[in-house]
């Protein structure tokens, strides 16, 4: 396509964040609408360190919808992608019928998306990806209002990435899912001392995807039903209270207990699912020994459907814990490769602490770590030079 053919080209680029659940979503009561068996709650991470960037262009010259993810063309006919595209076009058409300006929804779209973190390795890439897709489509087609229900149809946890800070995904009661939406509990500025440390154990794609894993859990795990009915409702209330009171020991305890219960459900699934590996188990042990040394919860772990740990802590405690991780998982790469994100001050470790923790170091057990904090929801990228698609509507070399 030559550029003069695309005089009508419209293009929007946005970024969207990863969110990491502290009360986990695991299991659907409706596979088509992606309605959960339990409510969940997450922290939205800062986009300076983890984000999806998506450019969407539309033109009457495009013959079909296309999508490229991390430089590779993907199948646009995927049912979840189609659900999001159809729903946004339906909402845009409704606005157009009321006289609001909107791009021509009959025009085909080209979508180009990149993650600045490993895809499908348990770092919530689908949540950021679908949130970014829906938000960018909404900007392109001038769709306003509640979008989390649309993002949910792409990936359940994507609905939480449409807001910054602390976000709950409500269980909802309606069979059509209209009330199963995300809602902000507190903004990213509410608890400025909270810090997040991601310990990347493996960037490999997991052997059992979340979608198939949770389907098997719903079919076979009695513990899943017990958790949804008897545990999560009370735990959600406790977690929201801990966030509002900025009560880190309670926040940390609830976070770790919920992570453990999620992985217990994975073991209770038949056949069982193993997302954690030996390094994951060592990290769990390290966190508990570190907290025991101080007699209080200073750091807390959570693991999604993968071996990588997400550590929550407070600004004053994080520097020392970073050194603890370095000591017990000594890196075999340089500092720039091993530590990324928000800088932390150097800290010294006492011989007494190292002796008390009493763990054998595992060299190269952790590939790298990312230091970050809570951050805002999706944003529009104003600089046209940062578009991932060129004037011909095809991916730029930089996006491949």
Swiss-Prot record:
It comes from Danio rerio. GO terms for molecular function: ATP binding; diphosphomevalonate decarboxylase activity. It holds the Pfam family MVD-like_N. It catalyses: (R)-5-diphosphomevalonate + ATP = isopentenyl diphosphate + ADP + phosphate + CO2. This is Diphosphomevalonate decarboxylase. GO terms for biological process: cholesterol biosynthetic process; isopentenyl diphosphate biosynthetic process, mevalonate pathway; keratinocyte development; regulation of angiogenesis. Keywords: ATP-binding, Cholesterol biosynthesis, Cholesterol metabolism, Cytoplasm, Lipid biosynthesis, Lipid metabolism, Lyase, Nucleotide-binding, Steroid biosynthesis, Steroid metabolism, Sterol biosynthesis, Sterol metabolism. The gene is mvd. It is an enzyme of class 4 (lyase).
